[in-house]
Amino acid sequence: MSTKRSQNRKEIRSYIRIVRNSVTLTKKYDESNKIVRTAFNCNIIYNAKNIACFLSFDGEINTYPLILKLWLNNKNVFLPIVSSSYSRKLFFVPFTCKSILYYNQYNILQPFYNMKDIILESDLDLIIVPLVAFDCRGVRLGMGGGFYDQFLKNWERKKFIPIGMAYDFQFVNYIPRQPWDISLPIVLTPNKIHFFHQN
């Protein structure tokens, strides 16, 4: 990605979303299966038990192959629930092959749930996080809603580890950072596990 383009958050978001939505079905299939192999070469994922993930939206890399692999390896999978656009809060509920899904206010699939199903943050081992772009410092650029920024705030003080998941082309040299932006310690792409030093 050009240096000029990488200087503007809005341009980065727009450009990557266009590229992401232009990925062919064959490429999507290949890349989503490659990232499963990459994920299970990451000891943090391999050894985790309670794993929060997400369902793909807006051209994001397909997470279903990874979720299936997690189930087959006896991992407990959880999906995010968006409480409201006002509070910008996320919480996570179990996702199994028997879960019934519906479209929320953002047209994103999420499970029907009871309040008693919500898992405590302290019981999550890791959270696989969607993103639009990431840079050489691990700075994450999301869709702009702020839900994950809010949930991941001060994640270093919590038990879970956040791990980004993206196509390789979603890496950019530099993202102009805002105070609310989160730096991820790890980002998975089909061809690489990116580790970032946390200051």
Swiss-Prot record:
Transmembrane segments: none
Domain of life: Bacteria
Gene Ontology terms describing biological process: folic acid-containing compound biosynthetic process; tetrahydrofolate interconversion
Any GO molecular function: 5-formyltetrahydrofolate cyclo-ligase activity
Key words of the record: ATP-binding, Nucleotide-binding
Sites where the protein binds ATP: 9-13, 142-149, 181
NCBIfam families cross-referenced by the UniProt entry: MTHFS_bact
Family: Belongs to the 5-formyltetrahydrofolate cyclo-ligase family.
PANTHER family from the UniProt entry: 5-FORMYLTETRAHYDROFOLATE CYCLO-LIGASE (PTHR23407:SF1), ATPASE INHIBITOR/5-FORMYLTETRAHYDROFOLATE CYCLO-LIGASE (PTHR23407)
Name the UniProt record assigns to this protein: Uncharacterized protein BUsg_396
Organism listed in the record: Buchnera aphidicola subsp. Schizaphis graminum (strain Sg)
